[in-house]
Amino acid sequence: MQTNKKQNWRFRQAISLALFSLLICGIVFPLLITGLAQIFFPNQANGEIVQFNGQAVGSNLIAQNFTLTIFFHPRNDSASGVDPDITLQDAYSQIPRIQDATGIPTDALNQMVNQNTEGTYWVFGSPYVNVLRLNLALVRAYPLIYNGFQ
């Protein structure tokens, strides 16, 4: 009888610990972190939504599926397939295709890539370009070429 009570007590203890852990790890902690993110990093916490002409057109954090030859394309070889950034080398390698498709001078496209280049943290990584921002810069700079995308 004593052993049975002891086993029941341990079972209740185990269930209580599991429920407490579930409550803390599954509800309290995520709500706390989400609340702190909304307070200190509201733009990032909401996905860095990009607005164009008053409409949401994408996120700076997730690659968009640009397939037309008149736009820069994101990396298709990233592990997740949603990497929003490309290297400078990748951006420069796409310039001839865009120049052929749009007639925009190569120098202007090079300048556009340079203006939209982001640095890195100290010595880590290499400079990169956000594809969505770069394509929106093209649409803004050349409204006659990209008039169906405004």
Where are these regions (language model features)?
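Short amphipathic alpha-helical segments at helix boundaries and their inter-helical linkers
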Residues: 116-133
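N-terminal leader/signal peptides at the extreme start of proteins
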Residues: 1-2
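Flexible, solvent-exposed loop/hinge segments and secondary-structure transition points
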Residues: 5-9, 13, 17-21, 25-26, ...
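Short alpha-helix boundary/capping motifs
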Residues: 43, 64, 126-127, 137, ...
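Short, low-complexity, Pro/Ser/Thr/Gly-rich segments in the mature regions of secreted, periplasmic
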Residues: 135-150
